[in-house]
Amino acid sequence: INIVSHSMGGPVTLFWALNLRDKNSPRLQKFVPIAGPFDGVIFTDDVPNQNRIKENGEPVWQNAAYQSYYEKRDDFPKGVSVLNIYGNLEDGTNSDYLVTNASARSLRWLIKDRVKYYDEKMIKGPMAQHSKLHENKQVDRLVNNFLFD
């Protein structure tokens, strides 16, 4: 199966892949999280520019959910292709208003050793706002090209 998710659908898919998937589950082939808050949500447990991604890809700050994902990282299915899409309003917050770029990009550290392919695409400007990302033509093109080319 291919899964395209928005917002909390990303962590829900990750949780499924790490904890609920079994031998009878469909094989995950492609995963496209859009604006996935894998390591915090602004106004809940994250603050703009509080966290950053180290040069090696590891997030400096890791919330409890992220730590639990990390402990189970070896259960992520091998051979999945991932396109991680996130937004940057370019207003100094390094976020899409609800999800920081660091939170979205923290997915790589969790699954980098398991995936066949991993890429990240930052969408910039007003149409990179959290709820507008899934209505964005640039995002539509990226998703279609990734899934069908």
Region locations from a protein language model:
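C-terminal catalytic-base region of ester-bond hydrolases, centering on the histidine
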Residues: 75-149
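Serine-dependent carboxylesterase/thioesterase catalytic core
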Residues: 1-79, 96
